[in-house]
Amino acid sequence: MNLTQLICELTLPCADNGRDFTRTDRIHRIRDLLRSTPYTCLGEKPLVQVWQHSDFDPALPLVLVSSHIDSLYTNYHASCDDGILLGTFDNSVTNAVILSLILENSLPQQVLVAFTGDEEDESRGADQVIDILQNAPPNPIHPEMVVVLDITEESYDSHSFTFENLFRASKEAHSAQLRFEKKRDLAQFLRDLLAPSDPIIIKEGEPDESWQYDEHDLNCFAFCLPCKTITGDMHDEKGVHVKESSVHQYANTLAEVLALILGHPNMKPRGGPTPTVLP
């Protein structure tokens, strides 16, 4: 199954009431597809599932990828014509991207993947992710960076991805190996990862789940896929347009960014030297 087919297959009903999922078709399909992979469920709560690779080592630095699966549509559809996808893709398209990296074995083993609910309201799913990590046996798990996946109305005509909503952990944060003095230092860090290209960076974009992870004092940013709305509202059931070429570039860049973050010299096993403040 290629990425376009996976996007169409995952554009299924998935909704919640702020306490529990009330429509679960997409959740069940994701579970079905993950059965053939080396990933197991690290923890599950009413509004989240967190998945880990069988070789994940909690003693090593890790990155959390969070992709919300709740949506506001009543009816769902997805199609592709002449390289342009059309569908109710908030947020099935990024669900499919991260799942495709898992299925292709293109995701670093130190990446945890969370599929969350309630992003469209209070982001309680993000809070439940943190609860799972803090209570993980035998010791709490502290991500060095959180990467939130979502769609954006920015830069559809010119770019295949954007970095938005940059947040940095405070000096008092529990275990950040990557420390940034100011938000602009995190922005420069992201530019340096992909040099010499010049990515679009929007330090404060539309609210998304990254805002909630910031409440837990974590380094965080949103990695967004540009879309074009039909009616001016990405939640309208007419859907949005997404370029097929952009989706592939977005997926490739996500895999690259995750590997580069985990390979950064400051990322040391726990108990190592105090990390340097960047830049």
Annotate each PLM feature.
Residues 6-58:
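A non-catalytic alpha/beta surface segment that caps or lines the substrate-entry region
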Residues 16-17, 81-89, 201, 241:
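A short glycine/serine-rich beta->alpha loop
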Residues 50-93, 114:
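Catalytic-core environment of secreted peptidases
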Residues 63-65, 114, 145-147, 219-223:
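Hydrophobic/aromatic beta-strand patches that form the interior of the parallel beta-sheet core
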Residues 67-72, 149-153, 226-228:
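Short glycine-enriched loops at secondary-structure junctions
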Residues 85-184, 191, 201-212:
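Acidic/histidine-rich catalytic neighborhood of metal-dependent amide-processing enzymes
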Residues 103, 228-279:
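His/Asp/Glu-rich mid-to-C-terminal helical/loop segments that flank catalytic regions of hydrolases
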Residues 176-180, 189-190, 196-235, 239, ...:
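C-terminal accessory domains and tails appended to enzymatic cores
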